[in-house]
Curated annotation (Swiss-Prot):
The lineage of its organism: Bacteria, Pseudomonadati, Pseudomonadota, Alphaproteobacteria, Hyphomicrobiales. Keywords: Ribonucleoprotein, Ribosomal protein, RNA-binding, rRNA-binding, tRNA-binding. It comes from Bartonella bacilliformis (strain ATCC 35685 / KC583 / Herrer 020/F12,63). HAMAP family: Ribosomal_uL5_B. One of its GO terms (cellular component) is ribonucleoprotein complex. This is one of the proteins that bind and probably mediate the attachment of the 5S RNA into the large ribosomal subunit, where it forms part of the central protuberance. In the 70S ribosome it contacts protein S13 of the 30S subunit (bridge B1b), connecting the 2 subunits; this bridge is implicated in subunit movement. Contacts the P site tRNA; the 5S rRNA and some of its associated proteins might help stabilize positioning of ribosome-bound tRNAs. GO terms for biological process: translation. One of its GO terms (molecular function) is tRNA binding. The keyword Ribosomal protein applies. This is Large ribosomal subunit protein uL5.
Amino acid sequence: MAEEKQKPRMKVHYVGVIRKILQEKFHYKNEMQIPRVDKIVINMGIGEATSDSKKPSIAAGDLSLITGQKAVVTYASSSIAGFKVREGMPLGAKVTLRKDRMFEFLDRLVTIALPRVRDFRGLNPKSFDGRGNFAMGIKEHIVFPEINYDKVDQIWGMDIIVCTTAKTDDEARELLRAFNFPFRS
């Protein structure tokens, strides 16, 4: 008999609680209009990649540990002489998370990683792009429990973009607030 896979905690919370909260607040005509998290894109830009081309692959390995999905090394699309960057040079790593892995990462981000950030005063509520997507940055990738602090030789930052199906920033803000994102007041 096949084992039934356990659903992510945040997904169960979204389906059971968050959808009802958003429906009551915004009075959607159709159930499909209720905003949901579409995908999460995590990007690490490695500044030292110009001098050492192995660093982006190390960063991709760390990003794979954090997300549970293989990271892709990103390359320069054009040459920029001022930054000593040539076209095709490896510059960083990125991962796009969807479905269950996305909800699992969201859970770890809100409950474990953000409370471990030094001098954390809350997320900026103005970091929305006008179309319901939220972007944030973390200065140290070691706040995630999957990274062994003793084995890390260099600390990198990362950009986290949460893409939602919300039409406005207010809808997206309420969606993420329901997911317990700690916004500044």
